[in-house]
């Protein structure tokens, strides 16, 4: 995943003695977040992309080794978390969400609420990003927790 979501993963894993979990599809981003080329369509998205790319160039990411590789449908009960993994590719190749208690969905950057709730402004694969946004919308009445911004009720994100 991107630095703004995993920059402290190594520190937290060591300090709390917990495993790092992520999708294997994003493993190439651990040493360098620029490994997956990002695109944006809107002016606001292009501004966010420019700021993100500058951050990737100057910020450092302590290299870490994931202990758990997440896949669609994985249940995390054995790790003490009542959650199910939902693959939401598009923002990155390995974007995942967590469905918790049946009515909460943590979506990372598959959707964004930086300025207003919307589909992801940045993506590695626009078609997959739109498919993931559609999948989220079809998951019914849930509270959506974004990687950025306040939670909102689920709705159709793609027409």
Please describe what each predicted stretch is.
Residues 59-61, 75, 82-157:
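Metallo-beta-lactamase
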Residues 10-14, 34-38, 102-103, 120-122, ...:
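Short, glycine/charged-enriched secondary-structure capping and boundary segments
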Residues 29-33, 79, 115:
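Residues that scaffold the ATP/ADP-binding catalytic core of kinase and kinase-like folds
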Residues 1-68:
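Active-site HxH/HxHxD metal-binding segment of metal-dependent hydrolases
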Residues 68-77:
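Short internal loop-to-helix segment that lines adenine-nucleotide cofactor pockets
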């Amino acid at each position: 995943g991107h630095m703004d979501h995993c920059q402290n993963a190594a520190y937290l894993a060591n300090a709390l003695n917990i495993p790092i979990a992520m999708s294997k599809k994003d493993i190439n981003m651990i040493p360098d977040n620029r490994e997956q080329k990002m695109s944006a369509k809107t002016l606001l998205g292009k501004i966010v992309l420019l700021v993100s790319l500058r951050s990737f160039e100057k910020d450092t990411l302590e290299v870490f080794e994931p202990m758990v590789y997440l896949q669609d449908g994985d249940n995390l009960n054995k790790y003490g978390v009542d959650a199910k993994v939902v693959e939401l590719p598009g923002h990155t190749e390995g974007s995942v969400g967590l469905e918790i208690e049946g009515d909460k969905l943590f979506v990372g950057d598959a959707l964004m609420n930086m300025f207003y709730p919307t589909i992801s402004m940045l993506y590695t694969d626009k078609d997959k990003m739109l498919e993931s946004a559609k999948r989220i919308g079809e998951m019914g009445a849930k509270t959506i927790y974004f990687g950025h911004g306040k939670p909102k009720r689920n709705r159709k994100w793609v027409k």
